[in-house]
Amino acid sequence: MTSTVAQICSDLKGAIDKKDELRIAFIASEYSSPSRLKIAQSYEATYKTPITEAIKKSLKGGTAEDLLVNMWVSRHEHRAELINKALGGSSDEEAIRELVFLCNPEDWHETASVYNQKYQKIMQDAVTKAIGSKSHWAKLVAGWMEHKREDRGSVENDVKYLKELIDAPVTDGNALAQFFASTTPDEYTQIADKFCEEYNLSIDQALVRPLKENEDDLEAYAAAHFALHGLPVLAAQLINKACRPKNGNERSICRITTLMVDQCLAAKYAYKLYGDMGADLSRCFDERMAPILRTLWRVTDA
């Protein structure tokens, strides 16, 4: 941190007192999740109130306030809370998929530790119980949560094997899930490049035919495909997806932002495949939310 923690806390206090949402967002965007947590701890020690409570008292509520509050919460605690919320009542399957795929092994294990202690149940078991085991996407999620990967050994053979799985008259959901859940990212990117070279289409495009009858299956495998190319690549794809509805998907964009904005530069680069992130955020979200999102992701309006 180039500024002292005391200076940052003072700047934050001023922004909160002035209800300056963009300044709060800008300060949050300047620091990593671990650094934000240290700042939050110092803020509470200095001003005798949690920064999250200070923001809630100052701002006028709504999703934008929630987003700014959650920027100052431990990402492991926040993900655990989001997973618990997604599993409650009628399960939010879209949220479950985002939270499972948009997470590296280390963060997953840390989140599980927080979840297991806070909610007194095993996170992986809770997710599996909520989504069942019959659908293709549920099988993929179950395997993915294991975070057990190893080199498969032969890229050329794996390309042929994957093509056979995709082209089979009846999709073998167990085998397909096992392939995606156990292949290392380094080897998968080689497989993906070779697959595209051999068959003149990407793996995610090839998966449309066997999975097109169920949008959830297709979305899950697309997420797995992009995640294996790097979480910023998946974040870009999910941001683009959140920008497709006329008024944007606020719940989704907030989940993605709080969990992935630390990797904004890589995500911005990956987003070029879809267009201009700043312009899309401005087009899809309201005049309060859009500037906050652009600030956090460090993108400008077109």
UniProtKB/Swiss-Prot annotation:
Annexin repeat segments: 1-72, 74-144, 153-226, 230-298
Listed GO biological process terms: cytoskeleton organization
Cellular compartments annotated: Cytoplasm, Cytoskeleton
Any Pfam family: Annexin
Keywords: Annexin, Cytoplasm, Cytoskeleton, Microtubule, Repeat
Domain of life: Eukaryota
Keyword Lyase: no
GO CC aspect terms: cytoplasm; microtubule; plasma membrane
Similarity-based family: Belongs to the annexin family. Giardin subunit alpha subfamily.
Its job: Giardins are involved in parasite attachment to the intestinal mucosa and in the cytoskeletal disassembly and reassembly that marks the transition from infectious trophozoite to transmissible cyst. They may interact with other cytoskeletal proteins such as microtubules in the microribbons or crossbridges, to maintain the integrity of the ventral disk.
Protein name: Giardin subunit alpha-5
Organism: Giardia intestinalis (Giardia lamblia)
